[in-house]
């Protein structure tokens, strides 16, 4: 139940729920398991770490759309959890059922924290890698980059506002999709 996770339960509360018979590895009909719900509802990182270590969960467990926990941590911009999962050996290049890796999943969903992307780059993600349709992280992130801080950061990693994807789309095209006229 997602509402449970919105209360930010600590590890002791989760342990008590497990003792009552709740399964920490159970998934709903859409393959969102307990840990995914905890991540997506911004439960405390220590609680999430505890859940990952429970039987039936692991850093390689497939969830909704065949995503691993690293996808969800990146999607939420949870840098601390991203760093933890990478340190535990989570695959930074693992692609979900849509061909999306954690870093481009984060960029496509508006995450712009340089510290999180640094963790991916230090773990071996090529900053200038081309993702779906030949788009790089700057192009994927630009629609949500209201102050262009992400674009500035990505430009230090070899990307540019002048980059073009495989279909000829520019940063302007990607930004226009957001409907933000000022951007």
Model-derived segments and spans:
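Sec-dependent signal peptide cleavage junction
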Residues: 1-21
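Ankyrin-repeat boundary/"N-cap" motif
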Residues: 1-5, 25-39, 60-72, 95-107, ...
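Generic detector of contiguous secondary-structure segments
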Residues: 14-20, 36, 77, 81-92, ...
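Ankyrin repeat domain, specifically the short helix-to-loop turn at the C-terminus of the second helix
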Residues: 15-23, 49-58, 83-91, 118-127, ...
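Long, mid-chain structured domain cores
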Residues: 64-108, 112-124
